[in-house]
Amino acid sequence: IPGFIMSETTLSYLGLGINDPAVSWGSLINRDISTLNNLKNFPWLLTPVWLLLAVTLAFNFLGDALRDFYDPFHSVFPTWKKRRLEKKIKTHPGQCEFSMAELQRSFLTVQNLFVTFDITTGNKNIQIQAVRGVTFSMKRGEILGIVGESGSGKSVSTTAISGLLPGNAFVEGRIFFKGIELTSLSQDQFRELRGRKIGCIFQEPGRSFDPLQSIGNVFAETLKNSEPELSKEECKKRAVELLNEVGLPDAEKRLKNFPHQFSGGQLQRISIALSLAQGCDLLIADEPTTALDVTIQAQIVELLADLRNKRGLSIIFISHNIDLVASLCDNIIVMYGGLIMEKGTSAQIIKNPRHPYTKALLASTPKFGSHYTEQELSSIPGRVTDPASPVPGCPFAPRCGFKKDECEKENFRCYKMI
């Protein structure tokens, strides 16, 4: 509202908005300013200016108050409601699959991970259980795929590893990375680890770049974050080496270009190069091939496989496309409703799926040549379960054609083949 008021005032002051005899903020200020000689004798002529300032500030304060009331976690200043909600953390002890020695020796182990979002609207508080007891581990140099529909908890699980969850997310469980317990780190400690040891790339890479910064400046800022003593020439040399490694042509010339001058596939290559700039050991690729055509998808997948072979890089690859994941990954985790439905090697998941949800995902994947037939594409009936009100037992049971009575019991067990 203040923006509309100021726009109308500016236009009317310039004579492009509301004109006499109608009255507006801009026309009043224009009249008063035009009689500047009288301001000394009649200072009250500036009254419309002060009233305009008071009205716009009042609307701003009202908007801030409403935001703090309906969404306390995103308030600028701490509120009593935010402090009260931060104390509401449930415990889920669960069963430990790994000993403490195994946790500390492993490359990455996620043990009994729960992520709950507290969303407050007015006096109503809703708890959304996005992840409900996820457990998995991976070795150095392994590529782990996570597949599932939107809302399955894939991205939230991996965002907890990188420490990028919002303030209204409560994380429980244990995450060990190279002997370091990530769930016990402060935000400052996470910043030291993020980028240097854990890198992330996301879908729609164009949104990850500042449109006003050249790619060369982005690389310089990233490199100096870990090595402040680097000179401009050294940063440029390192950036060219990284861009050549990810297969971007004319790397040195293109450092002067801005994000809008690159295609989606080229920007994703640049994102991967930036993730490697500080020497990360684990790369989290959250749907990096979304919105890219099939040819570019294959190139990105091939690039990730090459980086694993050359650098010994460990990769978590998230996607909806189970066939694409199987072509790249060593092991696959199938998630739905915040739980792991099934996990195994790529060959086991593709050739011998055991859970009905995995079978449904495979059946709904378009096959080569199917567009030449009149047969309709298979789809999974129903909707994804609501994380705000999870069902007991297997979350896929309401949509499953093979549902049994035991599927709706509390003790859900995922299918493990590794």
Q: How does the language model describe each region?
A:
Residues I5-F42, L51:
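Glycine-rich helix-loop "coupling/hinge" segments at transmembrane-helix boundaries
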Residues A277-D281:
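A short, proline-enriched helix->beta-strand linker immediately N-terminal to the Walker B motif
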Residues F170-E181:
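Conserved ABC transporter NBD signature motif
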Residues G163, P288, L292-Q375:
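P-loop NTP-binding/switch modules centered on Walker-like glycine-rich loops
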Residues V147-G148:
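The feature captures the beta-strand-to-loop junction immediately N-terminal to the Walker
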Residues L45, L103-F107, T120, E252, ...:
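Charged, flexible cofactor/metal-binding loops and thiol motifs
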